[in-house]
């Protein structure tokens, strides 16, 4: 049965990106229904591919800028009718919560096969975030209605 609202928030990679997620979600929506897409974007395009990789992505092409993302929704035939963008403080809280989670996991699982890998990530994640990703990444949830 078709629904009034369909959402993919933070997992568009499952469908190969926001365009693939849009295609899947559209199958579930009633005409005039609202689609919610949560997607990262570049607040500031990294100057080099190396900086993009330091942000934890493969390439600058992994994400669009905010104007590029809104334009891509338009190109797919959607009106953006609302958006909620994470501010930098909110993004900081999101990232920092991961560090605490890793720390607590390491305390509870010191002998786990993945402990060394998690420790290595925790050792570099805060500095990597504040050096590269914090200025480059944005994230938003976009409400879309098909034209």
What are these regions (language model features)?
Residues 61-83:
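Short alpha-helix
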Residues 8-11:
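A short beta-strand submotif of the Rossmann-like class I SAM-dependent methyltransferase core
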Residues 40-60:
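Short, glycine-/aromatic-enriched active-site segment of Class I SAM-dependent methyltransferases
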């Amino acid at each position: 049965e078709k629904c009034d609202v369909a959402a993919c928030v933070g997992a568009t990679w499952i469908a190969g990106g926001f365009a693939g997620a849009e295609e899947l979600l559209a199958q579930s929506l009633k005409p005039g229904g609202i689609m919610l897409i949560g997607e990262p974007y570049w607040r500031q395009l990294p100057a080099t591919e190396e900086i993009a990789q330091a942000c934890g992505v493969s390439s600058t092409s992994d994400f669009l800028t905010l104007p590029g993302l809104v334009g891509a929704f338009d190109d797919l035939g959607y009106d953006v009718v609302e958006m909620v963008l994470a501010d930098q403080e909110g993004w900081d809280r999101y990232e920092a919560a991961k560090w605490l989670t890793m720390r607590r996991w390491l305390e509870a699982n010191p002998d786990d096969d993945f402990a060394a890998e998690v420790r290595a990530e925790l050792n570099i994640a805060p500095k990597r975030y504040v050096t590269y990703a914090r200025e480059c990444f944005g994230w938003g949830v976009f409400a879309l209605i098909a034209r």
